[in-house]
Amino acid sequence: MISSKGKYFFTSESVTEGHPDKVADQISDSILDAILAQDKDARVACETLVTTGMAFIAGEISTTGYADFQQIVRDTIREIGYVHSDMGFDADTCAVISSIDKQSVDIAQGVDRNTPESQGAGDQGMMFGFACKETEALMPAPIYYAHKLSRKLTEVRKDATLDYLRPDGKTEVAFEYLDGKPVRIADVVIAAQHDDGIEQGQIYEDIKREVVLASLPAEMIDDATKIYINTTGRFVIGGPMGDCGLTGRKIINDTYGGMGNHGGGAFSGKDPSKVDRSGAYMARYIAKNIVAAGLAERAEVQVAYAIGVAEPVSVLATSHGTGEVSDETLTKAVKEVFDLRPWYISERLDLRRPIYKPSACYGHFGRNNPNFTWERTDAVDDLRTACKI
């Protein structure tokens, strides 16, 4: 957690959908969605590795449905934009290899119960949720605007505004803070994959105009703001040809950009019985409602589970000193308002649906997507009542 006193800088990064790790995340979540569309009670843990000319799918899936892995992988890669062999990764010609087993019976016996309500957690672990008043989405400003840059970088590629761009890319935004509030953008960093033969000067001016200045709030940029674009001077080789990509390697990008804590669990490719995903979504939902209720400027929620046990082993809600009530009162209110057993989380947030592929890039939180139910603020009144405010 960052300080609430003095002047300091905080930086977060985002990546585009063509980044190799995000290619892997999107493939994993596309497979998850294909299965949940047929079998909402499926158990899915799907991992993906992508490298030059190959995608490898592995994991454990127990379902009554069927997923055409070959077609899903190729369609996902094509949609991202890897459609030419000179990129080293082509939707139509890459090898697709799969090795899928059923969910372990040892895990299944801890999750499955005679009644859905008593469903145990799919694993042990701790999950965190965070919210703050820095942006309208109640997200930290650095990650919020880093994602805006990444989305814009993809947009100007796909609509051919900058038709020489390729799918891979990364962004980074450093904010200057004063007494806990973001006051200006100090630095912007962008790496954008491009066709061979494009001059660095053109790339810099185009991206500065079409991406940076078009995405970031003008009042936060001043003459001292530094903008770095493709600082090696060349970014032609990228995507899975440039780096091997794996599911679950962008967990800070997926959450709060390093602000607040992270339990370590990844999201993509996991059905909601995995509390790595559903627990983190619920923690965000709670934290966002705490802030939206005016109970705190910042809120962080931790929930922890034991495998096979429905009730969490611990729950903590903290305002990091910004609250209208004590952390003890806040935590008690959270326990009163929210049922944190896995089945009830899935029911309250309606998670057993094919909604996950859009979450696999540009962040799981702070998004204006009606399917992202964990972004609703419909528990505000209940929390205020429980806190006796």
Curated annotation (Swiss-Prot):
GO BP annotation list: one-carbon metabolic process; S-adenosylmethionine biosynthetic process
EC number(s) per entry: 2.5.1.6
Gene3D superfamilies for this protein: 3.30.300.10
Annotated metabolic or biological route of this protein: Amino-acid biosynthesis; S-adenosyl-L-methionine biosynthesis; S-adenosyl-L-methionine from L-methionine: step 1/1
Sequence positions that bind ATP: H19, D168, G169, K170, R234, F235, D243, R249, K250, A266, K270
Comment on bound cofactor: Binds 2 divalent ions per subunit.
Residues that, per the record, bind K(+): E47
Residues the record lists as binding Mg(2+): D21
Domain of life: Bacteria
HAMAP family recorded: S_AdoMet_synth1
Family recorded in the similarity comment: Belongs to the AdoMet synthase family.
Protein name: S-adenosylmethionine synthase
Organism from which the protein derives: Maridesulfovibrio salexigens (strain ATCC 14822 / DSM 2638 / NCIMB 8403 / VKM B-1763)
